[in-house]
């Protein structure tokens, strides 16, 4: 995220902050690029903008960084949500489910409204993790040569999936405990027959809690920055995909739309995010019968 922030500061945010909170000194001294664009400078020698020091809020001021990260996370989340959900809804999602007796009146609109409410709050709650990352408190690294050992550049992907799949399973399962389910997770189970737009239609604390493993991982284990951004996009789109409510795969290993749709219908099964491993270990795995989706679509 530090590289992203350097780039956006240079091309967008420097001028915005200089306009909204003027008070610094405009500069054309590009020697300051050594101080202002250190992170992106490791990849490409990007010169700072003429407004780089023209705001009272300097680039490394905590309030400015927090504000920038909030809007980046918020807008990025909205973009991925609407692009991914719209594509899946208009391509793979079975429109016959609109007539399902458990499909709510105006459900798509209600799902979008809930997501629009939740995404900015989740962004606020996520900002501290990104602040920690850009201030050097994580184990993110820039180049493959900086990995603990060469093979780690490939191992980081399955390790990330394994760690987050485990964490999300136990967090998700805990959210179904009677003491917290009603006020934390029940809102997401309002959508018994979900559309892709239900992917972020939940209590914002619920969504944030289930995202914690993604942000904890780079605090504990090395992760290349490019891989981190790619995985961030992947997990967001995966969250949309598993709410597609269609059977794209009968895999006994992958926790795809089939497994997650059964979770929405029967509640106490298939808590996993990527695989069925922890559901099998925890005794919560439910496999679809051969005719189950025909029954679901004809009820």
Residue spans of the language-model regions?
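Membrane-water interface at transmembrane helix exits
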Residues: 84-93, 126-134, 138, 168-176, ...
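Membrane-embedded alpha-helical segments that form the functional core of polytopic membrane enzymes
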Residues: 148-169, 173, 229, 235-239
